[in-house]
């Protein structure tokens, strides 16, 4: 295997070790540094200024609004010369004006934040530093405490020095302080929002937006962000909101230039695709593509050697791990360490790290230091927890300079890995993308083990912003002349896809603003009434972006109308009629299946070997084979159960080779075009069956061997060739003997429309262009309709309608009275933002919690906390079954009331998404005194995820205790306090190493 790779000139041409399987037979001569590095230290400064604003700063000291320069005494000096963007940022801060600093990871944004803190200290004022995650808050606290000493921390888990001049906190804590009218805010001059691009988070983005809206005008803001394409728009919103200037300082300069290499998995080495002048090398990309097998012209699904066109996640011949092994080994031999290897699956991280068992990167002296640091860190745990497998197995790995970092690790291990990495004692770190967030922990080299990731809906290519964020970890300022990025590619891909990924524009920051009951109730209960829900809606970034986009939408409509006029409309009526017949059949069949799929009708036909068609949302799995049917005990006896939600059908489905049943990938998905794929048993909810065939095939008794499962795939392919028009389906009346009048009528309607479709002249027409032209025209007309509707419907009016409907819900549930005055129930809900405030207050007031002991309370409350979904069946002990049923019934009631009040809500979806019973048994056992070693045997959820959920549960229970206290429920208050206390022990609540 040959590798083509430019080496940093400081290393010269090193002789390659004979033992390496990844040699460099051709090393280009590095260009002279002056020629090679042509990027300027570009710094763009813009400022949004309110109308009629008159600056009052003295120009000799502060420069002008358009050209800020500071000529006074610095609040803080640095041991290095500031970059242009840092100097301009300091000048803006000294003007006492808000600023957004948008720059790459490692560019030096922290220096700007530190200057704002130093200014506050100099001027005897207080400053708040917010971060999106508790773990990042802990890290930032340690860093700032080392620099400034007078620093406090408030995260919900921990409160340290709350009277300090600089307070580090999560954004949720800041929002709560703003709602409560905290006295602290009267002394605050600056609020620093770190990682402001988190504002686009679907769940939590609204917290940032509300906090920014509620901040008093006297407080100035510093926003730190990764590069984003609409920084100016964001600054204009801040200017509009607070009637004060907001500066934008943007740089895409990287202090350490990067070289980006592609590695075709199972193929021929490394190919430089983007050089350190950010030029995409097309010739190198083409050479890389040529290493992949070419598909035959007569068969798009097979390559010339009979294998699929891509190499799959596992590579062409050897396993994928061997490719990672070769790359890591080559990196170490060339002294390109430390290296961060990014994977998009936690289990994959661990598997890759374990595959390095033969490699050792640390000296004996370094091993001793690692062991000493490890033992010191473990002192925060009790004796019992120190012997956990997750801890004992980590030391040998760490001593060899290899580590894993992902959200499922024990927090103490995760923090230990971070500290060892910063000290240079971890040379190869296998991490998920969360490591690219937060503190600056750069490496010399970054490796991506895949070009695609699962985002909860589909496997998609990494976005440009994601690639920029992670690749930004490559190249250590002042240490490396160049950083190196290597991306592993497992199949042919479009040149533009890779170019856009590596060099594309970062995504814009888009508002995810939404109305919550928590917000409405808190605004209604504020005595001063300064902000109303209407005010918040009107001043949201969402509304600002909508109004700004209107002229562009108008131009788009004009262009689409021109396209619609040009499209060939000959025979349009005939094509439309044919299209409508197809649509009618699909609509009737969907309705028919929803009736057929009821357990009492369908279960007797779901015998082993039955062919069933599976559709999940927009994903069509095609035909699979039934293996087994099991009852889902976590679903109660409500309507979800009667519609089949209470049953799981284990089905053999054709899956992408990237998926494996041991959970190496987050979720199975169908194979890509041209991919061979493998058959796997996938648990499928009964309602996802979209068709039942009359055909059955023989299923081997043992499906563990790959060969046994692949024999089913061959059988399905053979049946497909025998039935080219599709597998014969079970007839609801003739085969299933369903005599229900509604179903008989539906079947007749479908057969009638099918006859019309078969008789239609378009059915046998070969004029594909006519159909395509019609479909495109229909798409264009639909898009025009949608855009016009968007222009017509004010976002403000939509939110007003939603506010009115949500207020009706609050009245029906007794949170507010007819005049909108907050009642006792509403006062309790005002204090709860960690779980569903409506549902949990319902349980508080309907007596559900009264009948439970504090262990059951802790277990039931855990259902409100987001947690990784377990792949195992939820089997609950008797003490928890009834409380869960009561919770599900209450959730269904609340969802139905919201539906009645015209809110767009799917009742069963609400119940399923709001209630997460996966840790009920675990929390119950822990609350009753079980050891951590015992409870981790009860679930397949990662240890770190269990601890994170338990800590969030403790925060939730404290909010419930405060809510009970606020409404005078002393017995409930005691119960919630006891539930919280029963959790707070051992490794679950061990102190952070940063504190």
UniProtKB/Swiss-Prot annotation:
Q: Which EC number(s) does the record attach to this protein? A: 3.6.4.13
Stretches assigned to the Helicase C-terminal domain: 323-524
Region annotation (Disordered) ranges: 1-42, 290-318
Does the keyword field hold Mitochondrion? no
Give the source's domain of life in one word: Eukaryota
Q: Where in the cell is it found?
A: Nucleus, Nucleoplasm
Q: Where is the composition biased (Gly residues)?
A: 307-318
**Helicase ATP-binding domain residues:** 90-246
* Catalyzed chemical reaction(s): ATP + H2O = ADP + phosphate + H(+)
Residues that coordinate or bind ATP? 103-110
Q: Does the keyword Cytoplasm apply?
A: no
Q: Name one GO cellular component term.
A: nuclear speck
N-acetylserine: modified positions: 2
Give TM regions. Answer: none
What are the Basic and acidic residues biased-composition ranges?
10-26
Q: Which stretch carries the motif DEIH box?
A: 194-197
Reported tissue expression = Expressed in inflorescences, leaves, stems, and roots.
The record's keywords, sorted A to Z, are:
Acetylation, ATP-binding, Developmental protein, Flowering, Helicase, Hydrolase, mRNA processing, Nucleotide-binding, Nucleus, RNA-binding
Record note on disruption phenotype: When combined with mutations in HUA1 and HUA2, reduced stem elongation and alterations in production of flowers along the inflorescence. These flowers are characterized by the presence of third whorl sepal-petal-stamens and fourth whorl sepal-carpels leading to abnormal floral organ number and positioning. Over-accumulation of non-coding nuclear exososome targets.
One Gene Ontology term of the molecular function aspect? RNA binding
Q: What GO terms in the biological process aspect are recorded for it?
A: mRNA processing; negative regulation of post-transcriptional gene silencing; RNA catabolic process; RNA metabolic process; specification of floral organ identity
Question: What is the purpose of this protein?
Answer: ATP-dependent RNA helicase that associates with the RNA exosome complex, with the cap binding complex (CBC) and with the NEXT-like complex. Involved in the degradation of a large number of non-coding nuclear exosome substrates such as snoRNA and miRNA precursors, incompletely spliced mRNAs, and spurious transcripts produced from pseudogenes and intergenic regions. Involved in the maintenance of homeotic B and C gene expression in the reproductive whorls. Regulates floral organ spacing and identity, probably through the regulation of protein synthesis or mRNA degradation.
Instruction: State the family it belongs to.
Output: Belongs to the DExH box helicase family. SKI2 subfamily.
This protein's name: DExH-box ATP-dependent RNA helicase DExH10
Origin species: Arabidopsis thaliana
Question: Coding gene?
Answer: HEN2
């Amino acid at each position: 295997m040959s590798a083509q790779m430019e080496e940093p000139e400081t290393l010269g041409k090193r002789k390659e070790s004979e033992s390496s399987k990844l040699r460099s037979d051709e090393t280009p001569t590095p260009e002279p540094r002056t020629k090679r590095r042509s990027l300027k230290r570009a710094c763009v400064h813009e400022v949004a200024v309110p109308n009629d604003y008159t600056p009052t700063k003295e120009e000799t000291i502060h420069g002008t609004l358009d050209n800020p320069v500071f000529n006074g005494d610095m609040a803080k000096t640095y041991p290095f010369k500031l970059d242009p963007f840092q100097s301009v940022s300091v000048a803006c801060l000294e003007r006492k004006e808000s600023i957004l600093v948008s720059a790459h990871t490692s560019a030096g944004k922290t220096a700007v934040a530190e200057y704002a803190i130093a200014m506050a200290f100099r001027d005897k004022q207080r400053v708040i530093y917010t971060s999106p995650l508790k773990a990042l808050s802990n890290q930032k606290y340690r860093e700032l405490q080392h620099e400034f000493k007078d620093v406090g921390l408030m995260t919900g888990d921990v409160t340290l020095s709350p009277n300090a001049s600089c307070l580090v906190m999560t954004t949720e804590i800041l929002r709560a302080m703003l709602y409560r009218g905290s006295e602290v805010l009267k002394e605050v001059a600056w609020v620093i929002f770190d990682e402001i691009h988190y504002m686009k988070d679907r769940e939590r983005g609204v917290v940032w937006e509300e906090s920014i809206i509620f901040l008093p005008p006297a407080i100035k803001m510093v926003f730190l962000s990764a590069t984003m394409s609409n920084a100016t728009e964001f600054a204009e919103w801040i200017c509009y909101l607070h009637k004060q200037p907001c500066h934008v300082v943007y740089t895409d300069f990287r202090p350490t230039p990067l070289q980006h290499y592609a590695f075709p998995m199972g193929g021929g080495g490394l190919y430089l695709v983007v050089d350190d002048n950010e030029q995409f090398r097309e010739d190198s990309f083409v050479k890389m593509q040529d290493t992949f097998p070419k598909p035959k012209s007569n068969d798009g699904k097979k390559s010339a050697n009979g294998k699929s066109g891509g190499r799959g996640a596992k590579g062409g011949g050897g396993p994928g791990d061997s490719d990672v092994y070769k790359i890591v080994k080559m990196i170490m031999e060339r002294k390109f360490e430390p290296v961060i290897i990014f994977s998009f699956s936690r289990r994959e991280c661990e598997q890759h790290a374990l595959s390095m068992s033969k490699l050792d990167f640390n000296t004996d002296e370094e091993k001793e230091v690692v062991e000493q640091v490890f033992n010191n860190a473990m002192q925060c745990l009790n004796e019992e927890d120190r012997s956990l497998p997750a801890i004992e197995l980590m030391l040998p790995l760490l001593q060899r300079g290899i580590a894993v970092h992902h959200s499922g690790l024990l927090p103490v291990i995760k923090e230990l890995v971070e500290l060892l990495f910063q000290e240079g004692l971890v040379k190869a770190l296998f991490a998920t993308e969360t490591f690219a967030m937060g503190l600056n922990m750069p490496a010399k080299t970054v490796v991506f083990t895949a070009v695609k990731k699962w985002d909860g809906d589909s496997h998609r290519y990494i976005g440009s912003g994601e690639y920029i964020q992670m690749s930004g970890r490559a190249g250590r300022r002042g240490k490396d002349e160049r950083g190196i990025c290597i991306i592993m590619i497992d199949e042919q891909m479009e040149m533009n896809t890779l170019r856009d990924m590596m060099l594309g524009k970062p995504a814009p920051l888009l508002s995810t603003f939404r109305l919550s009951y928590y917000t409405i109730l808190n605004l209604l209960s504020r005595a001063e009434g300064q902000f109303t829900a209407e005010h918040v809606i009107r001043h949201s970034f969402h509304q600002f972006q909508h109004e700004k986009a209107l002229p562009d939408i108008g131009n788009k409509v004009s262009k689409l109308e021109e396209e619609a006029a040009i499209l060939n409309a000959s025979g349009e009526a005939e094509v439309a009629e044919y299209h409508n017949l197809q649509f009618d059949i699909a609509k009737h069949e969907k309705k028919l299946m929803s009736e057929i799929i009821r357990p009492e009708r369908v279960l007797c036909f779901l015998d082993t070997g039955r062919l069933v068609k599976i559709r999940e949302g927009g994903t069509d799995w095609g035909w699979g084979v039934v293996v087994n049917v099991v009852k889902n005990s976590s679903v109660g006896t409500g309507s979800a159960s009667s519609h089949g939600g209470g049953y799981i059908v284990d089905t053999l489905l054709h899956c992408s080779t990237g998926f494996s049943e041991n959970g190496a990938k987050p979720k199975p998905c169908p194979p890509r075009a041209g991919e061979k794929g493998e058959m796997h048993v996938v648990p499928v909810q009964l309602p996802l069956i979209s068709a039942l065939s009359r055909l059955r095939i023989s299923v081997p008794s043992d499906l563990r061997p790959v060969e046994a499962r692949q024999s089913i795939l061959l059988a399905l392919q053979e049946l497909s060739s025998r039935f080219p028009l599709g597998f014969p389906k079970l007839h609801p009346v003739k085969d299933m003997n369903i005599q229900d009048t509604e179903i008989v009528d539906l079947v007749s309607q479908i057969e009638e429309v099918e006859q019309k479709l078969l008789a239609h002249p378009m059915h046998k027409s070969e004029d594909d262009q006519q159909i395509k032209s019609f479909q495109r025209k229909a798409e264009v007309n639909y898009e025009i309709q949608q855009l016009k509707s968007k222009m017509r419907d004010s976002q403000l009016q939509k939110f007003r309608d939603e506010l009115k409907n949500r207020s009706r819900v609050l009245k029906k549930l007794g949170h507010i009275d007819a005049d909108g005055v907050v009642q006792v129930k509403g006062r309790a809900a005002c204090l709860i933002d960690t779980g569903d405030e409506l549902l949990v207050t319902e349980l508080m007031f309907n007596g559900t919690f009264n009948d439970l002991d504090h262990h059951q309370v802790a277990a039931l409350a855990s259902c409100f906390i987001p947690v990784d979904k377990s792949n195992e069946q939820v089997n609950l002990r008797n003490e928890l079954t009834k409380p869960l049923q009561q919770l599900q019934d209450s959730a269904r009631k609340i969802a139905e009331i919201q539906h009645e009040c015209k809110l767009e809500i799917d009742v069963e979806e609400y119940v399923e998404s709001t209630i997460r019973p996966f840790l009920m048994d675990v929390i119950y056992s822990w609350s009753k005194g079980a050891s951590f070693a015992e409870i981790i045997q009860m679930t397949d959820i990662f240890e770190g995820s269990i601890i994170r959920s338990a800590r969030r549960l403790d925060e939730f229970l404290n909010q419930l205790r405060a809510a009970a206290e606020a409404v005078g429920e002393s017995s409930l208050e005691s119960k919630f306090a006891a539930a919280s206390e029963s959790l707070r022990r051992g490794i679950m609540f061990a102190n952070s190493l940063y504190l």
